[in-house]
From Swiss-Prot:
Superkingdom of origin organism: Bacteria
All residue ranges annotated as the PABS domain in the record: 5-238
Catalytic activity: S-adenosyl 3-(methylsulfanyl)propylamine + putrescine = S-methyl-5'-thioadenosine + spermidine + H(+)
Species whose genome carries this gene: Yersinia enterocolitica serotype O:8 / biotype 1B (strain NCTC 13174 / 8081)
Encoding gene, per UniProt annotation: speE
Active site: D158
Task of the protein: Catalyzes the irreversible transfer of a propylamine group from the amino donor S-adenosylmethioninamine (decarboxy-AdoMet) to putrescine (1,4-diaminobutane) to yield spermidine.
Protein location: Cytoplasm
UniProtKB keywords: Cytoplasm, Polyamine biosynthesis, Spermidine biosynthesis, Transferase
Record's protein name: Polyamine aminopropyltransferase
Length: 287
């Protein structure tokens, strides 16, 4: 790619988005995927895997704050957290802000992602890889949750879209392993795409998760990079009350955690579980 070239995302067959490229910082075909980082004048550094944008410097905080603080503050007493994926380090950064957490395990299939993100996206991890509570495991996520004897309070699946290496993280085998790897009252959350364009994926995840969890739903956030509408995050737990916490309880936990966020707040937390009717209808009829 030349410095003035346009980079086109290939997630959808018939339409998409493009980015102007100021400078290509890194490109490599790793053992598992084709990876590129380039600079864009609006979004800063952009990372893409297999032709699909994964994260940008400009708006990554929305995604990572919602993926971490919603389940962690809903739980309230999490000590052990498992991150599946998350090689750019931003999920780890947000989890590590919770000082009551004692252990953070991250399972990443591709060691190359971790290495180049530390070099080319340093603001994502912001030093979190040096946190003494952190443990990195290079392994397939499905294999890990089905082999480990450890139990976790919160599991965060920072998966790619269900193509290529990320496809296995949308299977029943993975969801069953996650359910088994949670402590009592534990919470599982996962990236589940833009529901207007990827509605079938949301329905499929909902149906599969419902076999292993008593309370399955989604929450949402608007993230500019992921075009097409709101992004949905799968939510699954055995405790139905955790999704219905009142704003006063969340506000108290937020203050006690000493968090300062750019997107997340307790009101956003409560409102994020309100879903558009077209998704609710799909979840009801496509079973």
């Amino acid at each position: 790619m030349s410095q003035k070239e346009l980079w086109y995302e290939t997630l959808h067959a018939n339409f998409g988005q493009y980015f102007s490229v100021e400078n290509v910082l890194y490109r490599e075909k790793t053992e598992h995927q084709d990876l590129v980082i380039f600079e864009n004048p609006v979004l800063g550094r952009v990372m893409a895997l297999d032709g699909v944008v994964q994260t940008t410097e400009r708006d990554e905080f929305i995604y990572h704050e919602m993926m971490t603080h919603v389940p962690l503050l809903a739980h309230g007493q999490a000590k052990k957290v498992l991150i599946i994926g998350g090689g750019d380090g931003a999920m780890l950064r947000e989890v590590s802000r919770h000082k009551n957490i004692e252990q953070i395990t991250m399972v990443e299939i591709d060691a190359g992602v971790v290495e180049f993100c530390r070099q080319y996206l340093p603001n994502h991890s912001a030093g979190a890889y040096d946190d003494p509570r952190f443990k990195l495991v290079i392994d397939d996520g499905v294999n890990f949750v089905n082999q480990t004897t450890e139990k976790f309070d919160v599991i965060i699946s920072d998966c790619t879209d269900p193509i290529g290496p990320g496809e296995s993280l949308f299977t029943s085998a993975f969801y069953e392993g996650c359910a088994r790897s949670l402590n009592e009252g534990g919470i599982f959350v996962a990236q589940n795409g833009v529901c207007f364009l990827q509605q079938d994926e949301a329905v499929d995840s909902h149906n599969k998760l419902s076999h292993y969890f008593k309370d399955v739903s989604f929450y949402q956030a608007a993230i500019p990079t992921y075009y097409g509408g709101i992004m949905t995050f799968a939510w699954a737990t055995q405790n139905r009350q955790l999704r219905q916490l009142d704003i006063t309880t969340l506000q108290q936990r937020f203050v006690e955690a000493g968090l300062t966020c750019r997107y997340y707040n307790p009101a956003i937390h409560v409102g994020s579980f309100a879903l558009p009717q077209y998704l609710l209808d799909a979840l009801t009829t496509k079973r």
